[in-house]
Amino acid sequence: KAESRGLGDVYKRQSHGAYKFSRKPDGDILAMDVIEKIHKKIPKTHLVMHGSSSVPQYLQDLINNNGGEMSQTYGVPVEEIERGIKSGVRKINIDTDCRMAITGHYRKIAREKPAEFDPRKFAIPASEEMEKLCADRFERFGTAGHAKKILVKSLDQMAQSYSKGELKQI
């Protein structure tokens, strides 16, 4: 059976949100070799990378160029996340990147069109940026095109499957 484990120990200094690292992370900060060692010992264990937003520079710039005051910060490089995926990581949290995409575009509209008050005029470009970001991550993380493999079940059906031990590793 596959199990899921969080990897708080992989970050030698774990942090969440936008302010993860004050410099581009390397082996002194990210212990990706730990993920690889875990995967070799227990290859059917699914791993989780909490707080793995990449905190893209272009989104920091979008926010700051439109009135924001984000201090320079660095996230988990997408290349390192891809490396983790090759070693059993199956869940990656990128919420901060999504929030940065939304915030950057809200700020841009507010700066460029200060008379604008219709939230749809803010939400549409913000949502488009987040969609672009997520599509990139789906491609890079190898998940694009797999939706048809997902069997849709109701919450009650899932609860019954769990209680009967019917769920199988795919």
PLM region spans:
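Single conserved hydrophobic/aromatic residue that forms the stacking wall/gate
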Residues: 1-7, 11
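Short, well-ordered coil/turn segments that N-cap beta-strands
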Residues: 5, 43-46, 90
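Conserved, mostly hydrophobic/aromatic
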Residues: 8, 50, 84
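Active-site-proximal beta-alpha loop/turn segments in soluble metabolic enzymes
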Residues: 9-25, 58-59
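Active-site beta-loop-alpha junctions enriched in small/polar residues
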Residues: 13-17, 50-56, 75, 95-97
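Active-site-adjacent beta->alpha loops and helix N-cap segments on the catalytic face
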Residues: 24-33, 54-58, 81, 101
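Alpha-helix-loop-beta-strand connector modules within alpha/beta enzyme cores
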Residues: 27-49, 62-63
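C-terminal alpha-helical cap/extension of soluble enzyme domains
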Residues: 65-67, 76-170
